[in-house]
Curated annotation (Swiss-Prot):
One of its GO terms (cellular component) is chloroplast. One of its GO terms (biological process) is RNA splicing. Its main location: plastid. The gene is matK. The keyword RNA-binding applies. Usually encoded in the trnK tRNA gene intron. Probably assists in splicing its own and other chloroplast group II introns. Signal peptide: none annotated. It is found in: Plastid, Chloroplast. This is Maturase K. HAMAP family: MatK (MF_01390). Keywords: Chloroplast, mRNA processing, Plastid, RNA-binding, tRNA processing.
Amino acid sequence: MEESQRYLQLERSQQHDFLYPLIFQEYIYAFAYDRGFSRSSLSENPSYNNKSSLLIVKRLITRMYQQNHFIIYYPNDSNQNTFWARRNNLYSPIISEGFAFIVEIPFSLGLIYCLEGKNKKIVKSQNLRSIHSIFPFLEDNFSHLNFVLDILIPQPVHVEILVQTLRCRVKDASSLHLLRFFLNEYCNSKSLITPQKASSSFSKKNKRLFLFLYNSHLCEYESIFVFLRTKSSHLRSTSLGVLLERIYFYGKIERVVNIFVKVKDFQANLRLVKEPCMHYIRYQRKSILASKGTSLFMNKWKSYLVAFWQWHFSQWFHPRRIYINHISNHSLEFLGYLSNVRMNPSVVRSQIIENSFLINNAIKKVDTLIPIIPLIAAXXKAKFXNVLGHPIXKSVRADLSDFNIIDRFGRICRNLSHYYSGSSKKKSLYRIKYILRLSCARTLARKHKSTVRTFLKRLGSEFLEEFLMSEEDVLFFTFPKASSTLWGVYRSRIWYLDIISINDLANHKSKL
């Protein structure tokens, strides 16, 4: 018990109690605005780039010093005499981005301290940032497992949950009060997630702050897995120690486990959920917990997670958000792929002197397939096809040139081929590419008030192929003599290490 308490105790040198005064410093906003340092999505917003001048920041800080005028308010009636009424669109992203940068400081320093304190070198793992790095992991491990928990992580339904989650790591009460005031006044209600309009508006205008709060919320949730994994494994992971450096964490976990099994011995309770062969994967709100254990063991974990969310986050976690599935007869939908484990039969002939034997072996293999029905639905939502998958023409601006139209369709097609290059069967990918190519042809024919056949006959089919050429086709044209060798590469799965976000069509969103 004492060893665990020392392991989970927050170091004195990592307690930062003076974050609030940084809000009044001009250089903080300069750091937050710098693209190379922050890499914030707000820096990509062209409407905000022209408004973040040093003069505006100075005026903002001057008004913030005037206590009578420092009122953050988001009313529908803009006639009220408030600090935010006239300059809502101007000051809101500046303060939110600066505040998000400030509260990230303890986390960044904590990570550096954790690595340097253990004589570790900070290694840039660029390849592990790729989404495709997850699938080789699935291929290596999931074929030996039995059950999987398919978990949909609930969103925080109250702003106080986000503030309390951040309070576990940040001890500056003034900054937390400002954050609470900022969230409550912006949403104009007690709920952040329940009103969809308020949540959507907040996440779009304050992307950096929203992502930081949501990631802190998920980090709090995932810390229990790191804790149990550390306690149940002899090869303890030290690189994730920063996730456990929080206030009162041990007491909360002990209380949750005691509630779960209603026994006072914490170590005895911990053995009930120990499993050395357990794997955890998460992307956004979707998480997977796979184990080699039995169905009873997975039901214990399901009950444990429900109790953890209800007592630790004070919110209802519906048991139907967690599905227990057997890996061998269930297709797992994750990151736009359908992954399942199938038996790959093979016949081996063995001959001993005059006798020969035929041995049938069945090897488990992880297949990654393309979900064609959701992709066709996404293409129909983006106006590339109808609900049956028949290509249709898109309405485009009259001032767009043919080259720009073809370039847009070609970029979408190449990105889709790039993302689904790891599919075991690419027939579905060919169908989606066919929909995009014919939709592009019909869009151009509609623009020129002609038919598709007449348009292609006039320009030639090579005109489209030049821009819609996939990466595999480039290999064949570049190395024609090695076509037989490249054909095997073309049919095999290829995982790329430069994909940092899920494809729009794969994510079933119409952002195109």
